[in-house]
């Protein structure tokens, strides 16, 4: 089995979206690595 490498990057921001299928069913939260990919993280803000 392969060993997992711990993350070295820091989540700088979180974005989320709520999911509804007729009624609210949940929320998806995505962590953004702004120090590693600042332009990509900014696109979500």
From Swiss-Prot:
InterPro entries: Cyclophilin-like_dom_sf
The keyword Isomerase is annotated on this UniProt entry: yes
GO terms assigned for molecular function: peptidyl-prolyl cis-trans isomerase activity
Chemical reaction(s) catalysed: [protein]-peptidylproline (omega=180) = [protein]-peptidylproline (omega=0)
Compartments where located: Plastid, Chloroplast thylakoid lumen
Domain of life: Eukaryota
Domain called PPIase cyclophilin-type: residue spans: 11-45
Matching Gene3D superfamilies: Cyclophilin-like
Additional notes on this entry: Was originally reported as TL18.
Cited function: PPIases accelerate the folding of proteins. It catalyzes the cis-trans isomerization of proline imidic peptide bonds in oligopeptides.
Family the entry assigns: Belongs to the cyclophilin-type PPIase family.
Protein name according to UniProt: Peptidyl-prolyl cis-trans isomerase TLP20, chloroplastic
Species, as recorded: Spinacia oleracea
């Amino acid at each position: 089995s392969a060993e997992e490498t711990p993350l070295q990057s820091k989540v700088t921001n979180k974005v989320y979206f709520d999911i509804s299928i007729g009624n609210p069913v949940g929320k998806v939260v995505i962590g953004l690595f702004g120090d590693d990919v600042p332009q990509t993280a900014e696109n979500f803000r």
